[in-house]
């Protein structure tokens, strides 16, 4: 006699949720594998200058530099040494 039951969803839901049901990964750039070389080259040239400008506070503005840009390590060390020397000088008085 042939087997009648071929599929069951028993315990499947628990197993599926054990590691969480995740969204499918959306890749930013599709593969250009197998694309004609001339077409791919033209696409690369066409893409130049089409970068999306950043939208800041209601209109298109230039992105401003940070108020406190990151300092080089030498500058930080020199400032710390100067601060320590000032503390020692104040303690001697």
From Swiss-Prot:
Residue ranges of the region described as Disordered: 1-33
Taxonomic placement: Eukaryota, Amoebozoa, Evosea, Eumycetozoa, Dictyostelia
InterPro entries, per database record:
Ribosomal_eL29 (IPR002673)
Q: Which GO terms describe its molecular function?
A: structural constituent of ribosome
A GO cellular component annotation here is:
cytosolic large ribosomal subunit
Q: Where is the composition biased (Basic residues)?
A: 1-31
State the protein's name: Large ribosomal subunit protein eL29
Listed PANTHER family: 60S RIBOSOMAL PROTEIN L29
- What is the native source organism of this protein? Dictyostelium discoideum
Does the keyword tRNA-binding feature in the UniProt annotation? no
- State any GO BP term from the record: cytoplasmic translation
The family this protein is said to belong to: Belongs to the eukaryotic ribosomal protein eL29 family.
Record's keyword terms, sorted = Ribonucleoprotein, Ribosomal protein
The answer to keyword Ribosomal protein applying to this record is: yes
């Amino acid at each position: 006699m042939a087997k009648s039951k071929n599929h069951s969803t028993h315990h499947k839901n628990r197993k599926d949720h054990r590691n969480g049901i995740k969204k499918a990964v959306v890749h930013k750039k599709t593969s250009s594998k197998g694309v004609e070389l001339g077409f791919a080259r033209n696409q690369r040239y066409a893409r130049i200058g089409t970068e999306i400008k950043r939208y800041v506070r209601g209109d298109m503005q230039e992105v401003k530099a940070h108020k406190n840009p990151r300092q080089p390590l030498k500058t930080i060390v020199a400032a710390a040494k100067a601060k320590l020397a000032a503390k020692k000088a104040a303690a001697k008085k």
